[in-house]
């Protein structure tokens, strides 16, 4: 009776079922994680392009080898349909017992979603128009012990998505696309900066003093020197030292660490790109910012008109420069300047839900109004200029 209960527990637990399959493979002398490199002939996206004109119901004698993760399985008697996913896309595997033989067919029937396999076969398109590989042999490359997120509900919990990105990447194609675009964007940044005469450098992440921004740092102890060190909160100070040393143009793409709040738009660890150029001014840096962003967009998009969150963003042409007071005035429906009485700015701030501190000056109040009601009105790329001195600690005066 106890043995029957144990078997029932295993059947009810998908992880235990998979572990039992792995143990069965090991008992048969088979390696559930492959024992040699698998040489694939194509990525799936290449097959989609090469056989785009293949007619419905047409078979070929073109042999291919592909590798990927099993994302779906459908058994219909002596035929099994798999959906295989690699880093570039998905394709159907058409598996017939006559082509595979009974033993291999039984092994394929025992595969689980999430298993990694390599498959060899001939290209074809089903009568229903599905591009497929008619499999004649396969190899288990890695047995998955954990089931994928449920097919129809997917992975929607933001907390899990952020903490387990590898799972998010498996089931959400748009996330994988974002990762790939990010890589292309960083490469475009580097190409543009290097073409413009900038040297890419690496500055220390562990620093003996905190500086370069007003943020709380992560603190660690350096045992060898018996001293407190800080994870950098900005790359600024060391980049400026390189200019002091004689470099004219430098930039760094690097990780920044700030021990502060965390939400979907703020991460304690993030990447920044910071650049410095000798003999330059605001106009020159505006030109740099516009150029590098347009270059990054060109690397991942075919147009300079982008659809984002229901709005069309136009990054073409020269980007406008608008004073902060002008943006705030437009949002308020009345003109405000740095000469506007503080008492009136306080009234406007409170009216817009801003908690005002007694020490705030006109410049600080305008900056707060900009953050609250001005910035949300900006859609296209815009250089906001003439920041108040109170919120511009590093600006020339």
Could you tell me what each predicted segment is?
Residues 1-397:
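Class II aminoacyl-tRNA synthetase catalytic cores and aaRS-like
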């Amino acid at each position: 009776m106890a043995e029957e209960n144990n078997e029932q527990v295993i059947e009810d637990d998908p992880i235990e079922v998979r572990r039992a399959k792995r143990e069965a493979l090991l008992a048969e002398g088979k390696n559930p994680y492959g024992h040699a490199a698998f040489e694939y002939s194509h990525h799936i996206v290449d097959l989609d392009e090469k056989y785009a004109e293949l007619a419905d119901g047409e078979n070929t004698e073109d042999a291919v080898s592909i590798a990927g993760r099993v994302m779906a399985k459908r058994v219909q008697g002596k035929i099994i349909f798999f959906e295989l996913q690699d880093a570039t896309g998905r394709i159907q595997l058409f598996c017939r017992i006559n082509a595979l033989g009974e033993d291999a067919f039984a092994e394929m029937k025992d595969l689980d979603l999430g298993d990694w396999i390599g498959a060899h076969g001939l290209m074809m398109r089903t009568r229903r128009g599905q591009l497929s590989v008619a499999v004649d042999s396969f190899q288990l490359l890695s047995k998955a012990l954990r089931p994928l997120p449920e097919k129809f509900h997917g992975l929607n919990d933001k907390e899990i998505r952020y903490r387990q990105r590898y799972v998010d990447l498996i089931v959400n194609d748009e996330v994988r696309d974002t990762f790939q675009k990010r890589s292309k964007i960083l490469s475009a940044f580097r190409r543009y900066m290097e073409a413009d005469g900038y040297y890419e450098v690496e500055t220390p992440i562990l620093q003996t003093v905190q500086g370069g921004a007003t943020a709380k740092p992560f603190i660690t102890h350096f045992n060898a020197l018996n001293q407190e060190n800080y994870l950098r909160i900005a790359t600024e100070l060391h980049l400026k030292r390189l200019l002091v040393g004689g470099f004219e143009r430098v930039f760094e793409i690097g990780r920044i660490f700030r021990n502060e709040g965390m939400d979907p738009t703020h991460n304690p660890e993030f990447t920044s790109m910071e650049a410095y150029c000798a003999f330059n001014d605001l106009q020159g840096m505006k030109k740099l910012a516009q150029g590098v962003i347009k270059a990054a967009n060109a690397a991942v998009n075919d147009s300079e008109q982008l659809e984002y969150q229901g709005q069309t963003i136009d990054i073409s042409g020269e980007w406008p420069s608008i004073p902060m007071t002008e943006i705030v005035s437009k949002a308020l429906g009345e003109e405000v300047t740095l000469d506007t009485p503080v008492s009136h700015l306080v009234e406007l701030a409170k009216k817009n839900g801003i908690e005002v501190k007694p020490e705030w000056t006109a410049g600080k109040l305008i900056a707060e109004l900009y953050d609250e009601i001005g910035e949300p009105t900006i859609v296209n790329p815009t250089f906001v200029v003439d920041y108040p001195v109170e919120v511009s600690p590093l600006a020339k005066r």
